[in-house]
Amino acid sequence: MAIAVRGADHGERSLTDLIERCAELKGELVAFAQSARFDRWLTPLLLEAAGPERLLDEGEAVRITDHFILRFRLPDGSTVVDRFVGGRRDLDGIDREMLLGWRDPVEGIFEIRRKDGDALVLLNLIDDLEYRTYSNAGRAAFRGVTKGGFLHACLVPVFSADGTWLISGAMSFYPRSSATEIARAALQLATSHPELVFRNPEKIEQGWESMRADRDAFVEFFGGDELVLPPAETEERLNAYYRHRQEDTAAGRPDRARGRRLPGLDFPAFELPRDLADADTIGVIYDEVDGLNFYADYGLLRELFADPSLTGRKPHQDLLRTYLREQSITPLPIRRLAAAHPETADSVFRKLLRKPGFAWSEHGEELLRRRKPWYYAQEPRPGVSVVGERLGELAAGGRRQRFTSARRVPGQPHRP
């Protein structure tokens, strides 16, 4: 377990002064965000959350507003914080650094380790890091919050107080007796938002190690890292694979398996989303970097690269355009097909792009970078999230157990 650290020595300002200044700035920032200039973006978010009944509790409204302030991207790519700082020439360097640091908040489900003066020492069950946390409302904000309980909260750093964090927005407290439900929610959050896990550098390396081992097992089971199957057979084969993996794990830990039912062995572990289940074929690729991904109608695309004369047919042409356009699809499937069919790739793209001089070896990477800049703008991350020791214990009902959670985000092109 590591300690979360941000910033450097806070110099002449005391911690109390910094927290008080945070409270002042946050109040001004909220008022700025709720002004008419941002109404066209904030109001629809609140209305969507309220639903047709137009009911929204105060805590949820605060969370939505806080997320909007810190992380929502406006049309020009900036955040509300960016615009607030840009319009306030009266802010000194520390104020600016502090506000800009809030654009990278820590969302998590935290176990309360202990109280320490006005602070709580929290263990984030998602990234397995400890955070020394204050509230700008003072010690009173933590009244009724007890050791061993849990908080669902968002934290922002207190610049430049080393390793000091502040509650941002609403927080929800859950007693120790809620551990089972909390563990389930934390596992779901870790799986659906692996970037929260990877705030911890140790989890990144552990994730790569786990993904490499899982990919090796996948290749051994299927005989390769790429499959093209009908949807029903995809589910059947993947469930057989996961069952095989669970049985191998159980066989290696007979002391833990003896005398109790093994979770997941009697139930399907994998089910395709509806968008994929309606496809004619599913491409399954377990890449060394991009991890395990699923692609709708991949068989049709493979036919196109095998026979470039099909480029003139609208279904094939539309599908390739979709693969190039969609942000849910990485460059991986197009790279794979171009590499597998070097003798036809040039012809396919020349006809699609209407560029007779196009050569995949010279222009392919440039094309992908132009169509999918978001992919190249981010560091590669493992497709497997490694759950921390404490969350593993809670999920196992108090028994020490190491968990890995596969992140399987299917590439799902919209049907042309």
Where do the PLM segments sit?
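A structured, charge-rich N-terminal accessory region that forms the first stable segment of a protein
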Residues: M1-L91
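Short nucleic-acid-contacting surface segments enriched for D/E, G, S/T with interspersed K/R
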Residues: N136-C154
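A short macromolecule-binding patch
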Residues: L129-A137
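Structural detector for short beta-strands of small beta-barrel domains
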Residues: L100-G117
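Extended, amphipathic alpha-helical scaffolds
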Residues: A269, P273-P416
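Short aromatic-glycine-enriched beta-strand elements
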Residues: D118-L123
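Short, charged beta-strand/loop "edge" motif centered at a coil->beta-strand transition
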Residues: D92-G101
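Mixed-charge (acidic/basic) macromolecular-recognition segments
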Residues: F150-L332
